């Protein structure tokens, strides 16, 4: 979502408001708006495959700590995910 617009088909939105499916559009490291706002962690038992989010299966095997860091507050915070710094990313 950018400027009130959303990408069709639950695909990702880049930091500049363009839709796509590559890391340029989906990676939170690029300030992108991946579709994790559809992810309700408590309701879905932290299972990214159980939700209707386009990019979810790419990150479904990440550790729980990584998923918590990006999605724990999506429900209460509204239609966007917040970086909480609750997890450390190892590259």
UniProtKB/Swiss-Prot annotation:
Pfam (any one): Chitin_bind_1
Keywords associated with the record: Allergen, Chitin-binding, Disulfide bond
CDD domains, sorted: ChtBD1
Biological processes annotated in GO: defense response to bacterium; defense response to fungus
Domain Barwin intervals: 27-91
Ranges for domain Chitin-binding type-1: 1-26
Highest taxon listed in the record's lineage: Eukaryota
Protein name as catalogued: Chitin-binding allergen Bra r 2
Originating species: Brassica rapa subsp. rapa
């Amino acid at each position: 979502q950018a400027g009130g617009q959303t990408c069709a088909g639950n695909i990702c939105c880049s930091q500049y408001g363009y839709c796509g499916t590559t890391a340029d559009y989906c990676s939170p490291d690029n300030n992108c708006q991946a579709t994790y706002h559809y992810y309700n962690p408590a309701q879905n038992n932290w299972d990214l495959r159980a939700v209707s989010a386009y990019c979810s299966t790419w990150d479904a095997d990440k550790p729980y700590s990584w998923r918590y860091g990006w999605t724990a507050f999506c429900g209460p915070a509204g239609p966007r995910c917040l970086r909480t710094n609750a997890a450390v990313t190892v590259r």
